[in-house]
Amino acid sequence: SMEILKDASSTAIYGSRGANGVILITTKKGAVGKTKVSYNGYYSINSVAAYPDRMNLSEWADFKREAYRTDGQWGGPEDDAKIFGSAYDAVKSNQNVDWVDMLMQTGSQMSHSVNISNGTEKTTFNLAFEYMSEDGLVKMDDMDRYNATLSLSHKLTDNLKLNANVVYTYLDQNIRRDPFNRSIYYAPYGDVYNEDGSINVLPFNDGQTISPIAEEVPGAYKNNRLTSHLVGNVGATWNIIKDLTLTSTFGFDKKDIRTGHFADTYTLDGAGNYSLADATNHSDVNWSWENTLAYSFTLGKHNLSLMAGNALYKNVAEEYKGAGHNLISSTMLFYNLGGLQDSQQISSSYVQTTMASFFGRINYKFNEKYLMTVTLRQDGSSVLAKDHQWGVFPSVALAWRMNEENFLKNVEQLSNLKLRLSYGISGNSAVSAYQTQGGLGKTMYAYLINNTENGAYGYYPALTPNYNLGWEKTATANIGIDFGFFNNRISGSLDIYQQKTSDLLMQKKVPSSTGYSLAWDNVGKTENKGVELVINTQNFNQKDFSWNTDYTFTLNREKITELADGTDRDISNGWFVGHSIKTHYGLEKIGIWQLDEAAEAAKYGEKPGRIKIKDQNKDGSIDNDNDRIILGSETPDFVMGLNNTFKYKNFDLRVFMYWRQGQMLHSEANGYGSYRIQGDPGIKVNYWTPENPTNEFPRPEKSYSDSSKLDALGYVDGSYLKIKEITLGYQLPKSWIGKIHASNIRIYCSLKNFFTFSHLDNYDPERGGSLSYPMTKQAVFGINVDF
């Protein structure tokens, strides 16, 4: 089970690690009684949720002809040979190839897990095993995962209890390089296979363009990642005397990742120039030791709980990497880097970070009606500058159970009414180590001696030092109310909050004259304020039929209130005072110049068919300095969730819907680079021609090159409504399953991510505008068995 903590008071005790909220995960534990065994398994069929259509060969041919016609270089079929060159024969024969489709496959996922638990009065345990395998949507993407979990608790004496939790995961992944950023823009033709059926790595007549499926040639490509991850903790709880408890927990988290990558000469990575291989070993070790002393007592109507503690955290990350070009034999893959003949590179790194914390909490209750919590925590982080490493973070919360008051106690319709107030300060030090110290990077330079090219390494300033880097601090005020009516058939909560963050930790662009590009800094202040509403209703609750609804609504308004150096804008980073951090700033497209607007278009140096940009300052010209505006934000106006659960006899149905409204995306499918206005192949769009005077996309034009105006095509409304999941289940009757001594068997099927409603055609806006790996939809079939 999971519990999400968000307000300042409940997260304050977790310090900087809870700066963005806390998710409490309660894992399964053993219980006293007979052994319980459960099995859960499922199989899913995965496919692409949505992906933009590409131009087929005839559509691309028309598109390219139009681009040349606009420039007066195409007047009819007699000019085809001139403009298509080596593609002319394919265009004549309509030899169509969809390269993106060639990469894809129907994916699948399979999981089997077994859980065993038991316990005595002194010892309980829970043991779980899981195996999961997956074949991705892209060929050569696959994964196998093995997982084992042990939870153990032992009562050593009447007042001393020991516990241990261990999770081990082993992951074997084959990961194909993202081929979409190339295949989308390939001309939709080519000789995909040789006469013998093997893959043709040079499918075009130019002798240099590598096939996007060249990696599928046996032995030509391998990108494998092995992950071994061990997480555990051991702890003891000692009831020293009545109401006084000492708890000590030691945690350990070790992750080892080995990544090996090989690409032969004729692959997308090799690009026809050389084979390449690299191998990386990365180790990440986290240690923690947490100790708390808690005391509580009750005196009459008063209850007081006190807690004090400290925690130590340490992280050590090591990495070793070797790489180079031109293996003696491709069969070596990445297992024998000594066989690399050129551009050999060896690198290593060691990163250590530490944190120390001291904290305390007071909980006070009077008559179970009036509650107060006060928390104080001090964190020290090694990643910050020497004189700024320690931060103090207090919080206070008050609550009033109003339904316990005499004037409300007899209101039968009221089940719960609790008013909450909280205020607290949290800290964030989430930056990489050594940002305060600066550092050098290494690169290879070529030089000539006796007309022979040689290589030598040079060093350059790669990391900007910041000797004043300190804590990012967020002050959060929250007022909330928990409510329940009609014996909690209607229940929920309403929260109104305001967060003010100062000394924001962000990377900012710095002038190139400094020799650097980016630097971490405390750059300014932001404010978030909003409303969160949760409503749970039991609509029907009869013997054979029930219907429950869970509704969530979130509204957040984010803005920058101050930037470094007192400026109101930082255009290079896209930051503007009074607006969201994730703001889109650019030229505003208001349509396409039409034929009857030729005279007006000419005033701006344009002509019908080109993008019409709004002249913001009405000076008669379009330029980046005066006509770019804030177009929108990636932060939505609101987010809603609606979950309905129906049960009829042994059947259950769950439908979960998700609505994200008012966000702007910069879509790679629409913007400069994807819309190849000069006639190159790409995404299929509705473009302007004299015969098709649309306002969506401009006319193809061979000589057009104004990228800032083309970039305006990419800003789109990213609002969407999704039916995220539909699950239908059936619980087998007890009379059926008793013969195999099972206590419960449930079979189910789910549709995940199947239905999306948005303004975007053939694109899932949850992907955020990117054209890389597409979103997945799943048809899942599963079974749960308990013995």
What residues fall within each predicted segment?
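Conserved small-residue
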Residues: 38-91, 321, 435, 521, ...
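Short beta-strands and strand-coil junctions in structured, solvent-facing domains, enriched
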Residues: 8-13, 30-33, 45-48, 122, ...
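Non-catalytic regulatory/gating segments with a bias toward low-complexity or hydrophobic composition
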Residues: 2-3, 23-25
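Extracellular/periplasmic, surface-exposed regions of secreted and cell-surface proteins
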Residues: 110, 145, 151-160, 165-170, ...
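Extracytoplasmic gating/loop element in the C-terminal half of outer-membrane beta-barrel translocons
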Residues: 86-90, 381, 660-747, 751
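N-terminal plug
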Residues: 1, 8-17, 47-51, 450-452, ...
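Periplasmic plug
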Residues: 1-8, 40-42, 46, 126-128, ...
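Residues embedded in well-ordered regular secondary structure
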Residues: 21, 29-139, 177-179, 215-224, ...
